[in-house]
Amino acid sequence: MTSPLLELDHVTKRFGRVVIAEDLSFSVGPGDTVGIVGPNGAGKTSLFGLISGDLAPGAGQVSFAGKNVTRLDSAARCRLGIGRTYQVPRPFTDMTVFENALVAAQQGGGLRRKASYAAAASALERTGMAGEANVPAGRLGLLARKRLEIARALATGPQLLLLDEVAGGLTDPEVTVLVEIVRGINAEGVAVVWIEHVVRALTSFVSRMTCLYGGEFIGDGTPAEVFENPRVREVYLGSDTIDTSTVEAVIEEEGTS
């Protein structure tokens, strides 16, 4: 049996009386594709913070590649192989696309000059941004900014890629482009955990989905199994008898609110 690449063991995080994560246990294997859904404020982005090191758990353990990384900060975890994107891409707008990827390779990945240049070039190639390498990032449209955000995470050399709503705000054809980029990254052996309200992006890509609500996991399985889960239906619609297509529509609607 393959050992988990990522493992959260009874992780809890609170801010005062506000529960961010409640006794979460969660694992991801090498090369896995996992989608995470949940209502706004469910704790999805906070979960990524606990995985990436942006947040420290109050209790429990986070392990990555067989190492206890609970007390490591985000920079150390990044260099071990955890790359992530953020909901709102914020590239260095006065730098070129290539320079943005280069900074990520050097500062995030800790790579030296020659290796960092190769990593940056590879990341742009894999995200379809090589042709815009010399374009100032401030001139990019939304899809290109999303691709650059992924490229910056890739430039750090991740074994695990955390995607935080990278399909938000895109048209259907643009979502298709993005999914194919992520599919190619996963085909290289990179595990992907993807938070998303654009359900069609997840259902066309992930093999496993989990639903987070109030800092707790309330459903886990294939996308179909999660959408058919009575608890998930009740959380989204106040009823456990609503059909699956309605649940999917409500999740997407939340992403635009």
Model region roles, listed by residue range:
Residues 2-257:
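Glycine-rich phosphate-binding loops of nucleotide-dependent enzymes
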